[in-house]
Amino acid sequence: MVSLTKKEAQAVIVHSESFPKSPALRGVAMGSLHKKDRIEWALEKAVELGVDYFYIYQADHSERARWKKSRLDQIILSASKQSKRTWFPELILADNLEYIKQDAHQRSQGIDLNLWAAHESASLQTKPPEK
């Protein structure tokens, strides 16, 4: 601390550290959950387990749910602080699984990618193109 008054505090940074982001990305795609507390709980647990990005999408036959992105971002921020993460996960609200498939290919950069839906008829498996 350099100086401290009732209206301001001044400090000098003595030391700083940089923590590089892990090259291995872990993502999760979640379909719409009707109850808001369930999606919030799932986000919180996924952050604690080390997920780097989330897709939340509206499935064709699920009830339409409305999420406030700012609220979900706050859940992620809070869980990240609690689990002492240096990088905050990214939240992506997607319209469908096709968007997730394309975006995940771009993020994976040649890493094997498997996407599975909960219902057998909706299962989707994909791998990046062979080099």
Specify the residue positions occupied by each region the protein language model found.
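RNA substrate-binding interface of SAM-dependent RNA methyltransferases
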Residues: H15-W116
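N-terminal positively charged helical leader segments and presequences
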Residues: M1-S18, S70
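Active-site/ligand-binding-proximal alpha/beta "capping" segment
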Residues: R107-K131
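Residues that form or immediately flank small-molecule/cofactor binding pockets and catalytic motifs
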Residues: K6, S16, N96, E120-S123
